[in-house]
Amino acid sequence: MSNAVGKIAQVIGAVVDVTFTDNLPAILNALETTNGGNRLVLEVAQHLGENTVRTIAMDTTEGLTRGQEVRDTGNAITVPVGEGTLGRIINVIGEPVDEAGPVKHEARREIHQEAPSFVEQSTEAQMLVTGIKVVDLLAPYARGGKIGLFGGAGVGKTVLIQELINNIAKAHGGYSVFAGVGERTREGNDLYHEMIESGVNKDPNENNGDTTGSKCALVFGQMNEPPGARARVALTGLTVAEHFRDKGQDVLFFVDNIFRFTQAGSEVSALLGRIPSAVGYQPTLSTDMGALQERITTTTKGSITSVQAIYVPADDLTDPAPATSFAHLDATTVLNRAISEKGIYPAVDPLDSTSRILEPRVVGQEHYDTARQVQEILQRYKSLQDIIAILGMDELSEEDKLVVARARKIERFLSQPFFVAEVFTGTPGVLVDIKDTIKGFKGLCNGDYDHLPEAAFYMVGTIEDAVAKAERLAKEAA
């Protein structure tokens, strides 16, 4: 540990300049000082001249004074890792924020790590079944892959992530890490309590701080926190996940929201004196994103499957922030406002969402053929919509009318009630097996259910549920 002591020279918002007479700390080193009785961590970002470093604060800087002493810790920010973090909420510097005492840990690990080398990485493709029909059928997730959930404000990214945590964490039984990056504190609080209620985590306050048996570690740096915390909290979460992976676990790593990581970087970038690039983002956008994403990978020891919510500013997928993240993903799930306006949830766009593993070699011929058939029908319906809008349904040929009828049923059958939304909708959630999903959509494409009304396919699980709903609707109408 270096014991070099410096003094604060100036404070500009989240950026603090510190002067050292000798032993200048290295870039990315953590410096410590106190502010109002609390420990404040500063991370070195730049060297200015011979004896000054420019740092980014991990907490608020109100109350700091010039001339105040700052100590160099001699290494990067370290956080507790190991099974003691499960069931607990920690912040960017690894301190507990759930008021349940100190975090028990096996070791502390630096948040800046090298990405695994090519030799250590594993490349086999395997499907991760989520129980969500539209995802499993049209844009399946790879075990150990990176998945992006793209969507504008309020189309259901966080609900979809919560459903995935619920479905996969329960079915998969492994450990999960949830990094809340610059999102609403209320949602983080809800998630924490929902996890305790659903049995994924144990309540530390009821067991004298003990969370043995918990499955998910939570790492939060929320909207109200300074940009330094939001720019680093994803790395803190990833460090916790990497430790489990290196112990041979298959880990699920959820990030909500990766855009806020970029946004925080752009906030401090200008304060650090960098010239902004396109749309005002930081010039190091691709480098920052690459440094995070390249560490999220599957090695020969274990795997990290990551699901990342990606906010799309003004619903524009060509914005540099979402566009940069596209390059790193194995599967993209695009949420569309037009679909959510129809009341179809999850509002996943079946034509825009993609997956690298949707090929017969990985998912099997029947699954592949059914998915392509569904997309073909939906694509034809999309191309007919202009004609329908101008001339009406009557001008279509009989064949096209049939395509439209099937497409509308498929659209509704892609909806599904969620477990985490039960409290709002009153409809019990369903988890649909991939075999049932393929069977249902194959029958729809082949016209086996042309006689059933559209309404029967809305918000049901399997095709048997749809048939039962049709019978119920017929009885009610009679």
Curated annotation (Swiss-Prot):
What SUPFAM superfamilies does the record tag this protein with? Answer: C-terminal domain of alpha and beta subunits of F1 ATP synthase, N-terminal domain of alpha and beta subunits of F1 ATP synthase, P-loop containing nucleoside triphosphate hydrolases
Q: Which GO terms describe its cellular component?
A: plasma membrane; proton-transporting ATP synthase complex
Q: Write the Enzyme Commission number(s) for this entry.
A: 7.1.2.2
Q: Which GO terms describe its molecular function?
A: ATP binding; ATP hydrolysis activity; proton-transporting ATP synthase activity, rotational mechanism
Keywords (A to Z) from UniProt: ATP synthesis, ATP-binding, Cell inner membrane, Cell membrane, CF(1), Hydrogen ion transport, Ion transport, Membrane, Nucleotide-binding, Translocase, Transport
What Pfam families does its record include? ATP-synt_ab, ATP-synt_ab_N, ATP-synt_VA_C
Compartments reported by the entry: Cell inner membrane
Which InterPro entries does the UniProt entry name for this protein? Answer: AAA+_ATPase, ATP-synt_VA_C, ATP_synth_F1_bsu, ATPase_a/bsu_AS, ATPase_alpha/beta_chains, ATPase_F1/V1/A1_a/bsu_N, ATPase_F1/V1/A1_a/bsu_N_sf, ATPase_F1/V1/A1_a/bsu_nucl-bd
Q: Which CDD domains match?
A: ATP-synt_F1_beta_C, ATP-synt_F1_beta_N, F1-ATPase_beta_CD
Per UniProt, what is the membrane topology? Peripheral membrane protein
Listed binding positions for ATP are 151-158
Reaction(s) catalyzed by this protein? ATP + H2O + 4 H(+)(in) = ADP + phosphate + 5 H(+)(out)
User: What function does this protein fulfil?
Assistant: Produces ATP from ADP in the presence of a proton gradient across the membrane. The catalytic sites are hosted primarily by the beta subunits.
Subunit relationships: F-type ATPases have 2 components, CF(1) - the catalytic core - and CF(0) - the membrane proton channel. CF(1) has five subunits: alpha(3), beta(3), gamma(1), delta(1), epsilon(1). CF(0) has three main subunits: a(1), b(2) and c(9-12). The alpha and beta chains form an alternating ring which encloses part of the gamma chain. CF(1) is attached to CF(0) by a central stalk formed by the gamma and epsilon chains, while a peripheral stalk is formed by the delta and b chains.
Q: State the similarity comment.
A: Belongs to the ATPase alpha/beta chains family.
This protein is called ATP synthase subunit beta
Q: Which organism is it from?
A: Parvibaculum lavamentivorans (strain DS-1 / DSM 13023 / NCIMB 13966)
